[in-house]
Amino acid sequence: MEKDDNIQTVSENVFEDVEFAEEKPAVPKKKSLFRRIINNITIEPALFIIMFASGLDNIASEQIIIWKTCINDFNFTEEICDNLTNETYGEEQGMVADELTNFNFIKTLVTSIVPTLMAFYLGAWADMFGRKPIFYLFLGSYALEQAVVLVCAYYLESPKEWLLLSYIPKNLAGGFAAWTLSVNAFISDISAPEDRAFRFGMLGLITKLAGPPSSQVGKLLFRYGNNVSRQFAYVSVFATTLGGICIGALLLIWRIHRYTWSPPKKDRNQRNSFSLMVIVDTFKTVFKRRPGKARIYILVLVAIVVFSIMPLFGEFSISYSYTFVRYNWQVDENSDYSTITSIVDICAQAVFIPVMAALKLNEAYVMPILFCTISIRHAVKAFAVEPWMYYLASFIDCLGFYAFNIRQSMVSSLVDRDELGKVMAFTSAVDSVFPIGISKAYSEIFKVSKTKKKIFSTLSY
């Protein structure tokens, strides 16, 4: 695909006040690690607030489904629903857990199909109109989603299916595929090639930093709210989440406001924004011939992540049901698990990422090692008959998340800047579509294996 010399690419004019290292003929001066971190801070504080707010209701959102299922679907009494972890109600607990996994599969279905299709258009739009409109679209729809969840919490006796309505606005805006694409493309645009892995690592670390406090604050909000009423417990958590998302969104908009972008002149052959050929163009961009082995590297990176991310999504779809049935974990125990494992991840990454940057370790060698830790994690969890083994598995994988940051960095280095949106759209679409089938498979395996205690933990993972 030839580029018209008269048309500027997005990356050539997106950020007028940003200079890239490869454009400087002089040898850049070496910066201290601290200075390098300070100079690279842009949207990270806003992302921290948004991720902190998002983590507040992770456990409560699962617990409210359990409650609505228990009360509405099975018509159990409040006494039974409050004591499902009691051995006396083992059968009722299993019935509720099965329904939870079924609902989570429907949720995955609803939250994956539209974002998968939208990802292709978002990539093209990001290249045509810039990254900021995608940010605005996602953040607005995310706040609207949380508002609907808040209404469902206020009307606690309402059917759990009402919660599915909350996912519609964000899905139409592209879901988390839009968020991932806009963040990754934005960071790639404002970063020199040698800084991209470091910047992506910082983003991953920021995400992890938000985890421990958000889990504990969410647990405390739920606990103290429950002293007033069950309804107030859920409302307090979801209302705080909505407020945090709005504050983070405003900060993010303010931080990216100074980065200006002038749209390129429209090529007469350029696709209409909603043309089906946009999807075709995305596939052509990903699979087209490139110098050397660049195309092979791109496809290999996509394939590696597909086979790594599938079990992670499968695990996520059954994790709450798994710990609920096997260890009798609920809000407090799951919040503590999230906090402790996040702290370990933060400490490990806080040491590893700067050391990797200082030693200039080859990303191509580091990434396979990190993916191996992810595989070991699943193997250990497969035999986690005791809670401490479940913790151990997550500790082994404390650096695994950084492998995905390296993937993004390597992909962004293999394509032209004006193609970056389309390539990242393709990877976002792939990341969105595969959870559909894998979530269903894990749900069915969970329902079969939980009745056979000896193989329960092994088959579920």
Language-model features and meaning:
Residues 15-40, 258-303, 325-326:
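Juxtamembrane intracellular "pre-TM" segments in multi-pass secondary transporters
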Residues 48, 145, 152, 156-178, ...:
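Hydrophobic core of transmembrane alpha-helices in multi-pass small-molecule transporters
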Residues 60-61, 176-192, 402-416:
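Intracellular juxtamembrane helix-capping segments at the cytosolic ends
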Residues 137-159, 372-385:
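C-terminal ends and interior cores of transmembrane alpha-helices
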Residues 166-206:
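Cytoplasmic helix-loop-helix junction between adjacent transmembrane helices
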Residues 195-223, 245, 428-440:
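Glycine-rich segments within core transmembrane alpha-helices of 12-TM secondary carriers
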Residues 222-243, 444-461:
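A membrane-interface helix-boundary motif in multi-pass transporters
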Residues 334-359, 370, 374, 437:
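Transmembrane alpha-helices of Major Facilitator/SLC transporters
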